[in-house]
Amino acid sequence: MSTISRDSCPALRAGVRLQHDRARDQWVLLAPERVVELDDIALVVAQRYDGTQSLAEIAQTLATEFDADASEIETDVIELTTTLHQKRLLRL
């Protein structure tokens, strides 16, 4: 499995999609035979997984957008990305 760093540019794997689940009234990552519920923070990060933006760029954008500490945001973004990658939902 690839090592995730601030320079990684993740994207959703083939067959995984970001979708609003009306039954749950929640955003989810929908993968074959499984659903991963996303909280509000995970959603704004997952919406930026396009394969072109690095995690550092995503974190900086979010830090600016939410007027938050960039290093804290970057740590959280890397942690979330690592979790989703371990669940085989992302490609790097």
From Swiss-Prot:
Keyword NADP assigned: no
InterPro entries hit by this protein: PQQD, PqqD_bac, PqqD_sf
UniProt KW keywords: PQQ biosynthesis
Superkingdom of the organism of origin: Bacteria
Pathway this chain belongs to: Cofactor biosynthesis; pyrroloquinoline quinone biosynthesis
UniProt-listed GO biological process terms: pyrroloquinoline quinone biosynthetic process
UniProt GO molecular function: quinone binding
UniProt cross-references to HAMAP family, sorted A to Z: PQQ_syn_PqqD (MF_00655)
Family membership noted in the UniProt record: Belongs to the PqqD family.
Assembly, per entry: Monomer. Interacts with PqqE.
NCBIfam families for this protein: PQQ_PqqD
Cited function: Functions as a PqqA binding protein and presents PqqA to PqqE, in the pyrroloquinoline quinone (PQQ) biosynthetic pathway.
The name this protein goes by in its record: PqqA binding protein
Gene expressing this chain: pqqD
